[in-house]
A protein has these predicted regions:
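Active-site phosphate-binding and catalytic loops of NTP-dependent enzymes
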Residues: 1, 29-36, 49-60, 81-83, ...
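Conserved catalytic network of the ASCE P-loop NTPase/AAA+ motor domain
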Residues: 2-3, 38-39, 61-66, 86-91, ...
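Conserved G1/Walker A P-loop phosphate-binding module
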Residues: 2-75, 94, 118, 134, ...
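Residue-level signature of catalytic and energy-coupling elements of molecular machines
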Residues: 14-15, 21, 38, 74, ...
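Switch II of P-loop NTPase G domains
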Residues: 54-115, 286-292, 328-344
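Canonical P-loop GTPase G-domain recognition
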Residues: 131-224, 375-382, 388, 393, ...
Length: 502
């Protein structure tokens, strides 16, 4: 058995600096091209121990570590993290929860904590944006303690106040926490590492804590059979010039080799194919943005690997990848089917149609819609086709005649169908925005319906008999009245109050 690289997931609320922190660590700028500054697709960055050591300086001595480095997964929010973890391949071994030191806990921070608790994933908190503390004097790339000591007393006390607020919020959520250098037992307490994704202050400490925790508590779990059949999770399916459809995957066990037969989760049945070529980025390159791949004979855990093979067009992001070795093809197909069965979205007899670009985002959408109490009629991976419009039109309630498309295109032949149909399309590449837009539409539609109903309601009239306007006493009485409220109509009974009696 050999020790593999621990897989690190980075979680946190929107705009708290997840991507910027990874950018600082890997020195690239992925976040510039991301929708709404939210990382919506999964990538992986392998950071070798030698690089960590040079970044962390005296804090990390390579000879103290057996683990080869850290593999960072760039999760699009915590939904994908939980999805990838739930698929049998405990994809993240350890997590970093990024919290803006000024904003403290936000709804998605609490949600991420729930997931970490539920999956039992060890984590550290990166208290980000310390450089925005009023009066802060930045020291590029420095460990936290020397840079903290170099600050004015005022800046120190303001930062302390924010840090202890985060520690208090962790406590409110049932986690005992403290600044990482004060933590005696990391199995009982969460370490909080103050960092700046902009100046790099505290980043050496964060890498040190991640390496230390992995080495100390996860060394046994990192032991893998290097020659065993590869196991991984699809991150993305992409067309590459010269190769056709390729699959980007994170391998977390065993090895995948050129010429291997693999089973990959697909839109219909699992896909059985043969690996024609394996491509890997150079170290310190990010699998989503790096164009310069090198061809390799094999890809061992843990690493992001791009596989070129026939028939991968229908492979689904988030699905399992399994190498067929030491077992029959049929056994591996059954294993992949069983994993995919765990993540089927529950649908109702009436509801909206949901389309998303990956299994992870489809499940994330389904979870978010369930929380918002929006029923789903059908949920599928892929672009919006005429069939989706036809299905949406069959919804019973008007508000459900809608398609919610996440990160997908409207096919040209579906555009005409949509214009002719009474179906509303919502499309966005940020999940929470998509659901917010749909909820606004439902509220506006309900308000319009209520107004229509109210307009049709005839309110009872309240009238006052005008003095000196009684023209006839009875059979029939003829009087002049002032209408005080409501609508006075023909052939309606009238009465009057005497005290409380009608």
């Amino acid at each position: 058995d050999t020790l593999r690289t621990p897989i690190v997931a980075v979680l946190g609320h929107v705009d708290h600096g997840k991507t910027s922190l990874l950018d600082k660590i890997r020195g690239s700028a992925v976040s510039e091209g991301e929708a709404g500054a939210i990382t919506q697709h999964i990538g992986a960055t392998d950071i070798p121990l030698s690089t960590i050591s040079s970044m962390a300086g005296e804090l990390v001595q390579p000879e103290d570590f057996d683990l080869p480095g850290l593999l960072f997964i760039d999760t699009p929010g915590h939904h994908s993290f939980s999805t990838l973890r739930a698929r049998g391949g405990a994809l993240a071994d350890i997590a970093v929860l990024v919290v803006d030191v000024n904003d403290g806990f936000q709804p998605q921070t609490e949600e991420a904590l729930d997931i970490l608790r539920r999956t039992g994933t060890p984590f550290v908190v990166a208290a980000n944006k310390i450089d925005t503390t009023p009066g802060w004097n930045p020291n590029e790339g420095e460990p936290i303690q020397p840079t903290y000591e170099a600050q004015s007393e005022r800046a120190q006390s303001m930062l302390d106040e924010n840090l202890y607020q985060i520690i208090g919020q962790l406590s409110d959520n049932g986690f005992s926490a403290d600044l990482y250098w004060r933590v005696q037992d990391f199995q009982k307490n969460i370490g909080v590492v103050p960092v700046s994704a902009i100046t790099g202050e505290g980043v050496p400490d964060l890498l040190t804590v991640l390496m230390g925790l992995s080495q100390r508590f996860m060394k046994e779990e990192m032991a893998i059979d290097v020659a065993g059949p590869g196991k991984g999770t699809v991150l993305e399916v992409k067309d590459e010039r010269g190769f056709g459809a390729t699959v980007d995957a994170v391998m977390y066990d065993g090895v995948i080799r050129t010429g291997d037969t693999v089973v990959v989760g697909g839109q219909g049945d699992p896909i059985v194919t043969e690996v024609r070529a394996l491509l890997q980025p150079q170290p310190l390159a990010e699998i989503r943005t790096e164009k310069q791949f090198e061809t390799v004979a094999e890809g061992g855990a843990a690493a992001g690997v791009k596989s070129a093979a026939p028939d991968l067009d229908d492979a689904m992001a988030g699905a399992p990848v399994r190498v067929v070795r030491d077992r029959t093809e049929a056994e591996v197909i059954e294993e992949v089917k069983a994993e995919l069965a765990e993540i089927e979205v529950e649908t109702e007899e009436d509801g909206v149609v949901v389309k998303a670009d990956t299994l992870g985002s489809l499940e994330a959408m389904a979870n978010a819609l369930e929380e918002a109490e929006v029923p789903i009629l059908r949920a599928e991976v892929g672009d919006i086709a005429p069939r989706d419009v036809a299905i949406a039109e069959t919804a019973n309630q008007d508000e459900h005649k809608a398609i919610l498309g996440f990160n997908v295109d409207l096919l040209s032949n579906a555009r005409d169908e949509l214009e002719a149909a009474d179906v509303k399309l919502f499309s966005d590449d940020v999940i929470y925005q998509l659901i917010e837009d749909y909820e606004t539409f439902v509220e506006e539609r309900k308000r319009a319906q209520q107004e229509t109903v109210l307009d049709k309601i005839v309110r009872p009239a309240r009238v006052r008999i005008l003095p000196d306007h009684t023209f006839r006493q009875n059979d029939p009485a003829v009087v002049g009245v002032e209408v005080l409220s409501g609508t006075l109509q023909n052939n309606r009974n009238v009465g009057k109050f005497e005290g409380n009696e009608f």
